[in-house]
Amino acid sequence: MRVHEEILKQQKIPKSLVGKRIWEDRLADIAHFEDYLGRQGVIVLKFFLNVSREQQKKRFMKRLNTPEKNWKFSASDVHERQFWGDYMLAYEEAIGATATKHAPWFVVPANNKWFTRLVVSAAIVEAVEWLIDRFRLPCAGVVRTC
């Protein structure tokens, strides 16, 4: 999830909703909705790709120094880096408030893209295999499943 500050500022949130508990209430709503989905049989997998500050800086520099990657870079990226600690606290709070049995978070080290892809793929494969096993019907007249 990436929140663009400039987009967030344009949101038309009714003033009556913007109170001291706006984020706590929203996180609770998210957790309740995801629990509802889980009880309905929907598999909810959430991944937080945890890139270190140093790795993020390397990637930003590569985007600046590689013309075909310039489109990925925004000046707001430089400005937002000063709030790294605030973002980490917000992520920690959001993950803690919305991690449930029905909708777990996978906090994945993401400095090495190959490792990140491996971990995410493995979690998805495991969920799909669970679904296949859950909905597999027994073959007629045979003890084993198809």
Regions found by a protein language model. Give the residues of each.
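A glycine- and Lys/Arg-enriched "phosphate-lid" helix/loop adjacent to the NTP-binding pocket
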Residues: 2-27, 37-89, 136-143
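Arginine/glycine-rich "motif VI" loop of SF2 helicases in the C-terminal RecA-like domain
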Residues: 36-40, 97-100
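NTP-dependent small-molecule kinase module
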Residues: 87-146
